[in-house]
Regions:
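Low-complexity, Ser/Thr/Pro/Gly-enriched N-terminal "stalk/linker" regions
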Residues: 5, 13-66, 76-119, 169, ...
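Long, hydrophobic/aromatic-enriched structural stretches that serve as scaffold segments
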Residues: 87, 101-143, 148
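Residue-level signal for alpha-helical transmembrane segments in multi-pass membrane proteins
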Residues: 11-14, 137
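Well-ordered alpha-helical scaffold segments within catalytic/enzyme domains
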Residues: 67-83, 90-93, 130-145
Length: 187
């Protein structure tokens, strides 16, 4: 019961600057990711210049909120600010439809059945949503970018509103996504 609130409160505290989480290397020693060959290989293979992370293992060459958010964490660790911004901007434009503050990111984007490109599944994925919050909060703190911190807090509010339910006998629980997941009826 308190684990969920602990995680959400921790993310909020990180975002507000009241708590910090070590990334594993300080900013000065990270450079721009050029000294992390595996990050560079991932970027070259999976990330388009506009910030879209492509899953080449899928027929639709789709992108997911998980791929975008995990890549943002790796960009943060690599201190690759340019790539981080590209990843976030692509996510906001395509997974959020430029509606940060009113919806959570769609979990899947790619080639639709009719051949057009766009959101394939608009449902959210709470694991990715929390990684977005973490990456944004830490980027706001490390790079002194208050807009990232604000974006993290905005997403956190939506996570609590859209993905947390009160389960009788258990208390607040984080669902895997915004819709399509059964909960125990209230008695």
């Amino acid at each position: 019961r308190w684990l969920l609130y602990g995680a959400l409160v921790s993310a909020a505290l990180v975002g507000s600057g009241k708590m910090s989480i070590a990334i594993g290397a300080d900013q000065a020693s990270c450079g721009s990711g050029a000294d992390w060959p595996l990050w560079q290989a991932f970027v070259e293979r999976h990330i388009q210049s506009d910030g879209r992370v492509i899953d080449h293992a899928t027929e639709r060459l789709h992108s997911t909120s998980e791929g975008q958010s995990y890549a943002m964490v790796f960009a943060l660790i690599a201190h690759d600010r340019t790539r981080f911004e590209q990843l976030w901007r692509w996510s906001v434009a395509n997974l959020l439809g430029n509606r940060l503050g009113t919806q959570l990111p769609a979990w899947q984007w790619g080639r639709r059945d009719d051949g057009s490109w766009g959101v394939i599944d608009a449902n959210s994925a709470s694991d990715a949503d929390l990684w977005f919050v973490y990456a944004l909060a830490e980027a706001g703190r490390l790079w002194q970018q208050p807009q990232y911190t604000q974006d993290a807090l905005t997403m956190l509010e939506l996570i609590v509103a859209d993905e947390v339910v009160d389960l009788p006998g258990l208390g607040p629980m984080l669902l895997p996504g915004r819709s399509g997941f059964a909960t125990i009826p209230q008695q």
